[in-house]
């Protein structure tokens, strides 16, 4: 509930008039609920994968009954991250100087909050070129877990463990998928995360080429898709009632009022991808005596209104507050330039009542 009130305060200064420092405190509180320690400043706006757009559009539909299932991957979750590889190219030893590329892959799993339950971590390796364009060659893709490292890097075979080996021939699918859920779970402790080593090399050269002929190794882009569940932000989606459609007739009684939050107005448009804004609404109005059924008053509010009618100076009227809220899904860049899709409860005021 405080999330809606926070935005209302920042946008309707005439009503709330928070000091600048108070506004920063409220912003930090909201950002922390998103797992962010500060306002993200993306170094570059990475393209949003098509799968992420599909999940976002599906999650935004009001017909979805369980917002805590990511049907695209068949697992439970309300947070989806596309993590960027933070590793680098490794200088190959002389014995592999021809037709072989080694790369260190690293994904920072410590960005997950402690409360999050990891459901899936899937490595997606995509080739930037069509393998058919590189000639009739067979490539091997070997993925290793790095067990330990030194200042010189991974220096011995005992320092790594083979996770998967795969061959790719012309016409093969342009991507390789590897389930790393169990390994990624251990990576949540930074001291256990040494990353992985990817080795890509030519297995068979065309008979027309001699042993030391150079064959172009395709560039490869690695991403780790991480799906997790925050149980504190996961409730069954409630269908909006007719009261969601705000009445247009003027009235001073307690009811939802229109409030559209545009993220550009608060300077967040550079890191929030979608939506660009949303209808949050707020509650405002009087709770007059006698309270009608339409004002959704509690027994306590009814009695308080009765006492107020006899002693208006000593007893205030009940307050007009949100009693029913609904969630939204947000797509944004986090502090590590990862693309994140997250489901948030209590973001839209649907109904108000006297309390």
Swiss-Prot record:
Pfam family, any one: TGFb_propeptide
Q: In which tissues is it expressed?
A: Abundant in ovaries and eggs, and equally distributed among all blastomeres.
PROSITE patterns assigned to the protein according to its UniProt record, in alphabetical order:
TGF_BETA_1, TGF_BETA_2
UniProt KW keywords: Cleavage on pair of basic residues, Disulfide bond, Glycoprotein, Growth factor, Mitogen, Secreted, Signal
**What cellular-component terms does GO give this entry?**
extracellular space; protein-containing complex
Propeptide at 16-240
Major localization listed first in the record, in broad terms: secreted
> Magnesium as a keyword?
no
Instruction: Name where it's found.
Output: Secreted
Q: Quaternary state and partners of this protein? A: Homodimer.
**What does the sequence similarity comment in the record state about its family?**
Belongs to the TGF-beta family.
The record describes the protein's role as: Serves to facilitate the differentiation of either mesoderm or endoderm either as a cofactor in an instructive signal or by providing permissive environment.
Q: What is this protein called?
A: Protein DVR-1
Originating species: Danio rerio
Show the taxonomic lineage.
Eukaryota, Metazoa, Chordata, Craniata, Vertebrata
Instruction: Name the gene behind this protein.
Output: dvr1
